[in-house]
Amino acid sequence: MARKTTGRDRDQVHHQPDIARAAALIADPSRARMLKALSDGRALPAGLLAAEAGVSAATASAHLGKLVEARLVGMESAGRCRYYRLASPDISLALEALAVIAPPLPVTSLRDSSTAGALRRSRTCYDHLAGRLGVGLLESLIEGGLLAGHDGTHRPDEAVRDGATGYGHDFDYRLTETGRRTLVRFGVDLARLPARRPLIRYCVDWSEQRHHLAGAVGAALTARLFELRWLRYGSSPRVVHVTEAGAEGLAGTFGLRPAD
């Protein structure tokens, strides 16, 4: 005999996340390209997002309206211009997770091939570094005695809570005293980092299947590298390039020799 539905049951059903709605919004190829373009945390104009998605300005506006309505994307006005950014870092992490299970897009041009390779080499994961550059930076911090807690490897057969991508939970990295002194000398003001955000976090990198540095320190260190012009954005959103000064600085400061 079927059990009678109670008010508590209805509340539980009502509060279940509407995964299907979010998935349907992301499933559209044009909207997916726009969301990927926004995954580095920057606010981008509608015109650039239209070009990235390969659609007209009117079509892009309609897509962006749906994303704003669903609170996947936020809109900011600056004069007559409208800029869009992801509403939350969690959306970027969700896209990274989908990248693990999604089949690769067919490479139809040299540009597509170059972009895919560049993303694996060095990219942003919302506001911190990922790809081989991000993984290499974390490894250099560990080898230099700036970070402790784990060796940066991801072992799926031993993982308890860590998945193939996204924020990790199995290990507790921490800054050593050497790490604190080094970062302060480098221009990262640890005392002014937002208290609401974990100081140190890590993500499992979807392309490298190792850890890269996240959290307040990961974001602040990445911002400092851009401030020093050791890094610059590429022509495709999220792609990051190491400048000549950056190659020398990363090697001298952190013992990191990026292949870029």
Give the ranges of each region predicted by the language model.
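Amphipathic alpha-helical dimerization/coiled-coil segments
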Residues: A2-D18, D40, L93-G152, R185-A220, ...
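N-terminal helix-turn-helix DNA-binding core of bacterial DNA-binding proteins
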Residues: P17-S56, R82-Y84, T124-C125
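Short helix-coil-helix linker/hinge
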Residues: L25-R31, S88-P89, L119, G131
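Short alpha-helical elements of helix-turn-helix
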Residues: I26-L35, S61, S92, V135
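Canonical helix-turn-helix DNA-binding module
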Residues: A46-V73
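Beta-hairpin "wing" of winged helix-turn-helix
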Residues: V68-A78, R82-R85, H150-D151, G234-S235
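Basic, amphipathic "hinge/linker" alpha-helix immediately C-terminal to the N-terminal HTH DNA-binding motif
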Residues: A78-I101, L175-G179, G246
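Minor-groove-contacting beta-hairpin "wing" of winged helix-turn-helix DNA-binding domains
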Residues: R80-L86, P156-A159, D172-L175, R238-T243
